[in-house]
């Protein structure tokens, strides 16, 4: 997977997409608002990923139905991100206004996760919530990439605040959301989403950056490489199916307490934080074949390790690999989506990356693992995820071929 990248091609990734004549001033208030948004949004995710399955189990669902509900939540990420991107590209829609609208509706839906359980009602609310919740993140990431270019601040150092929020929510959730306290889950979630809506009011207005001006500052595109990159993103996210859907239940079954499970999640995200803070720009400049290939290899080792052992020391070491399987992979992928996509399709390209990876990949992975867990057990699900990560590693070879053609 070695790469030979001409310096002028390599520098295209950081060639400004925004002409200096229309570059707006980004205030400290806007930067603080973006950090607060990421913190609250991912704090909500830090509750949903580890504890929503536990909440559903407490309501009486078996593991198969937990997989259906979590898969339905992930499935909304297939439609919402590209649809939101297309709306912003084809209509004169203000990003900040659209983000406020979607954040407000996601908050309203989360308040309807009421304890009185009715399967049809609950599934409908989960789908509505997931749709608006999924539309928010790729738009915010796109906005943050623009802001990072304008303000010369690393995207990773904006995005890292989401990891901080995830850490606190995962750890505190493990302490609070135990036993009967799991009924507090929907109310804590709603509070965090209210904070995301408040933070979105402080986002900068970038409406003066229009499509033609972006086109004039465009880099050469590579659509075939983009398609392979999207498939690789699908494989990586699908390989997380057992982890995001059933890791907490797996650890409960192995005898760990809620606090210990929360700590396991925290260890993974702490590794993610360190990588994002210190190596964000270096990773984004490196060849995608090298970075994504190494990340997929380490992901396969991570899932294989979880399949064969629940030893506490091994779990701690394996959780450190989250820095590769999520953080390094994400930083590289969003940067190369930006390089390979058509300049006037930047927003929808990020939406498609989110849709195919976090949406379709997560849906397939979680629902497949739900079936495997119900019939074969937790270890078998992690073996399956190992295979999926290795499949993505094979696809990196095709990406490298197209990357060399472009270079």
What kind of region is each of these model predictions?
Residues 22-28, 203-237:
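Juxtamembrane intracellular "pre-TM" segments in multi-pass secondary transporters
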Residues 184-202, 381-398:
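Symmetry-related core transmembrane helices of the 12-TM Major Facilitator Superfamily/SLC fold
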Residues 56-57, 87-88, 160, 175-180, ...:
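Interfacial helix-cap and linker-helix signal at transmembrane-aqueous boundaries
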Residues 97-111, 290-305:
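Structural signature of the two symmetry-related core transmembrane helices
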Residues 39, 109, 119-137, 234, ...:
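Hydrophobic core of transmembrane alpha-helices in multi-pass small-molecule transporters
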Residues 26-74, 226-264, 330:
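Helix-loop boundary and gating motifs at the non-cytosolic
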Residues 80-93, 177-178, 274-287, 373:
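Helix-to-loop junctions at the C-terminal end of transmembrane segments
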Residues 127-161:
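Cytoplasmic helix-loop-helix junction between adjacent transmembrane helices
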């Amino acid at each position: 997977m070695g790469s030979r990248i001409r310096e002028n091609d390599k520098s295209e990734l950081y060639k400004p997409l925004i002409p200096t004549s229309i570059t707006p001033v980004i205030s400290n208030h806007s930067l603080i608002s973006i950090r607060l948004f990421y913190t609250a949004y991912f704090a909500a995710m830090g509750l949903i990923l580890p504890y929503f399955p536990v909440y559903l189990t407490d309501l009486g669902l078996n593991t198969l139905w937990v997989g259906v509900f979590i898969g339905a939540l992930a499935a909304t990420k297939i439609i919402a991100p590209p649809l939101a991107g297309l709306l912003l590209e084809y209509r004169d829609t203000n990003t900040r206004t659209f983000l406020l609208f979607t954040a407000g509706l996601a908050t309203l839906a989360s308040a309807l996760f009421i304890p009185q359980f009715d399967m049809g009602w609950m599934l409908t609310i989960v789908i509505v919530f997931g749709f608006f919740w999924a539309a928010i993140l790729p738009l915010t990431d796109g906005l943050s990439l623009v802001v990072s270019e304008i303000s010369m601040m690393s995207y990773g150092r904006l995005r890292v605040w989401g990891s901080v929020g995830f850490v606190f929510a995962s750890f505190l959730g493990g302490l609070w959301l135990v036993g009967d306290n799991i009924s507090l889950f929907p109310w804590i979630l709603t509070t965090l989403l209210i904070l995301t809506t408040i933070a979105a009011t402080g986002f900068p207005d970038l409406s003066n950056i229009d499509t033609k001006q972006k086109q004039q500052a465009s880099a050469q595109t590579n659509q075939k490489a983009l398609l392979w990159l999207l498939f690789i993103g699908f494989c990586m996210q699908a390989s997380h199916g057992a982890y995001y859907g059933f890791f907490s239940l797996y650890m409960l079954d192995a005898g760990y307490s809620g606090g210990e499970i929360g700590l396991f999640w925290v260890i993974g995200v702490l590794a993610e934080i360190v990588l994002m803070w210190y190596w964000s720009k270096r990773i984004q400049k490196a060849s995608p074949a090298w970075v994504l290939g190494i990340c997929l290899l380490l992901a396969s080792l991570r899932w294989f390790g979880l399949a064969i052992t629940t030893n506490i020391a091994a779990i701690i070491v394996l959780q450190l690999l989250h820095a590769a399987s999520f953080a390094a992979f994400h930083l590289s992928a969003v940067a190369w989506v930006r390089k390979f996509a058509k300049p006037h399709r930047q927003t929808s390209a990020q939406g498609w990356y989110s849709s195919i990876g976090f949406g379709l990949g997560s849906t397939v992975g979680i629902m497949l693992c739900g079936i495997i867990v119900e019939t074969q057990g937790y270890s078998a699900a992690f073996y399956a995820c190992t295979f999926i990560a290795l499949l993505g590693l094979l696809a990196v070879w095709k990406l490298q071929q197209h990357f060399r053609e472009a270079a």
